[in-house]
């Protein structure tokens, strides 16, 4: 029973979602030549770092979690694990994860993990989430770290491919998070969390969602235009982006914002999973014959 509680406090659903993006970034950079020990070290290392961040987040948020329907049954809120024990647990997970990334992958992968961790725990959870409407924007940077870590674990350098991945996954986080804030509007309101839909209104949030999906669409295409992913990826990226944008635009006419937002959120998971899978299997070796070079 205790094992279940220690697992729950790490938010396994979030870990799993991040692993899909790590695999996408790693296999995109590997280009068919997979270093399996490096692959395992990277996956386990990122999993432990994400788990650590989630436990710290649970510790920090335990006061506001009590006020939200979605989070009122979390392990720390119910007192199933003491706050002191959770801090030790989170620290040990983090140390193990960072060591695996440093020694098993490379220092760059580790430092990217540190940056994502500091942004999520130190900047977002401790301050921005409670005090600023821009908390989601800052938090999106940490959410985009895993695929970049996976990519840089292979390359050992932060190149334009890594920058494109950072842009894709950061931009994806915004409509994804705003959709959650709309269908969980009352929860965020009750906990006094200043997310955009609560502070500026749902209609403003819909405008932001539309603009971020357009920016996301452009960023996804850059992987193919830059010669990192192939035409199959390009077709899937375009199809996913157009469909997601269509869903966003239909939001201006819906009668029930909550139902619409839940569907938009659900498709965001499908979209990012599809992109992660396609970049894993439809990679290209960058050379002068990229689509971008052909255009110019």
UniProtKB/Swiss-Prot annotation:
GO terms for biological process: heme O biosynthetic process. It comes from the Bacteria. It catalyses: heme b + (2E,6E)-farnesyl diphosphate + H2O = Fe(II)-heme o + diphosphate. Residues 29-37, 98-107, 217-228, 288-296 are periplasmic. It is a multi-pass membrane protein. Belongs to the UbiA prenyltransferase family. Protoheme IX farnesyltransferase subfamily. HAMAP family: CyoE_CtaB. This is Protoheme IX farnesyltransferase. It comes from Escherichia coli O139:H28 (strain E24377A / ETEC). The lineage of its organism: Bacteria, Pseudomonadati, Pseudomonadota, Gammaproteobacteria, Enterobacterales. The gene is cyoE.
């Amino acid at each position: 029973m205790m094992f279940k509680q220690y697992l729950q406090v790490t938010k396994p659903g979030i870990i799993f979602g991040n692993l899909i993006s790590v695999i996408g970034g790693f296999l995109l950079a590997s280009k068919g030549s997979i270093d399996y020990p490096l692959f395992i070290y990277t996956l386990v290392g990122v999993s432990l770092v994400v788990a650590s961040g989630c436990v710290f987040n649970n510790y920090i948020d335990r006061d506001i979690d009590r006020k939200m329907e979605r989070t009122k049954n979390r392990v720390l809120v119910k007192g199933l694990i003491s706050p002191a024990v959770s801090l030790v647990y989170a620290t040990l997970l983090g140390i193990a994860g960072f060591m695996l990334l440093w020694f098993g992958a490379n220092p760059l992968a580790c430092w990217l993990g540190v940056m994502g961790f500091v942004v999520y725990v130190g900047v977002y959870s401790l301050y921005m989430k409670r005090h600023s409407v821009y908390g989601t924007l800052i938090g999106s940077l940490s959410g985009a770290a895993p695929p970049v870590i996976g990519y840089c674990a292979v390359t050992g350098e932060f190149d334009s491919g890594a920058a494109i991945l950072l842009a894709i996954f950061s931009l994806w986080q915004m409509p994804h998070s705003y959709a959650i804030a709309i269908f969980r509007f009352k929860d965020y309101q009750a906990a006094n969390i200043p997310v955009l839909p609560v502070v500026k209104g749902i209609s403003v949030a819909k405008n932001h969602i539309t603009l971020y999906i357009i920016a996301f669409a452009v960023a996804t295409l850059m992987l193919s235009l830059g010669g990192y992913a192939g035409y199959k990826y390009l077709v899937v990226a375009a199809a996913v982006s157009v469909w997601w944008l269509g869903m966003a635009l239909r939001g201006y006419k819906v009668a029930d914002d909550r139902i619409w937002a839940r569907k938009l959120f659900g498709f965001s998971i499908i979209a990012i999973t599809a992109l992660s899978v396609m970049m894993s299997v439809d990679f290209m070796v960058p050379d002068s014959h990229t689509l971008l070079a052909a255009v110019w």
